[in-house]
Amino acid sequence: PLPGGGRTTLNAPLNAPLNGRTTLNSPAYPAPQQGYGPRPVKFPEPGATLTSARGSYQVLRTLGSGNFGAVYECIGPFDQTYAVKMVRPANRPYAEVQAEWAKEVQRLQSLRHPNVVYIYDAFEDGGLFYLALERCDHPLAAMLGTPMQEGLIIELARQTLAAVQFLYDNDVVHDDIHAGNVLITHTDRPQVKIADFGISTELYGMAAVRPNVVHHAIMAPEILASGYTSRQSDLYQTGLVMFHMLVGSPALDTSAPYEELARQIAEGTPRMRAEAIRTPLGHVVAKMLRRREAYRFGSAREVWAELRELDAWKQRSLFPVK
């Protein structure tokens, strides 16, 4: 989960529903333990067994939990380890939760790419909906806190941008790129996997669409000002992730109230802070964080074309294994 920031609907009062969702800050938002209206459901605990047509999954532990879902480490068919995501009912109608689950399943099955998390199975058990995904080592968020080496930043950005470009080419906007949804697996070098397509949006040939919901701290200026998202919105969010890697702290105080975050986003604070770094990499990040989409990079390919020319990339050393 993103530290400090809830999610908000767009162009609506902060407690108003949009496409079946409400804000996490709203008193109207149900507690995550609730089921489908008055119908309670039992969430899995360590030791529980989940059953699919393809086999069973034994729950080992909870990897992460939020208001819209929880992820469990499980041992599945052939004793392989999986990250099994549960879609939380959150007091919504059964059909709505089923539709959300089916949308994410379809999206992941259609988006096969080395830098997109792989889905192996999808099933319903005990009235709850699950996705069995490849198990990665940890989210990028676990690596943050101090500035990273620029060569490593560019390598992680390269893979993230490859995923973002793949989404662009398939008319999909992720809408939720942050360090918790950028997963890392370590082999001889870090492998990036973009996860959580629960609120992703298909453009259907359009330049921009109204998103379902967005985290306060990663709102692109166009979402805040006009309530729409576009391909450049994902680039803006990727720029925020790169800033965090470069500086060791986020561009915005994620614990700040919504009104303060909105003011800083509207004023271009993230871009100004990136410019203040005064390095070639900082300038690339600053361009990704410009307030107007037309002044950002036109695509993830354009970002990479600049990154690959930086000395930090050309002179990079071997990447750490852990």
Indicate residue ranges for each PLM-predicted region.
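Conserved end of the kinase activation segment
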Residues: 222-232
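Conserved short submotifs of the Hanks-type protein kinase catalytic core
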Residues: 126-139
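Activation-segment/catalytic-loop signature of the eukaryotic protein kinase fold
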Residues: 122
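Catalytic-loop of the protein kinase fold
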Residues: 168-185
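Conserved N-lobe ATP-binding subsite of Hanks-type protein kinase domains
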Residues: 70
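AlphaC helix of the eukaryotic protein kinase fold
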Residues: 91-110
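Activation segment signature within eukaryotic-like protein kinase domains
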Residues: 156-157
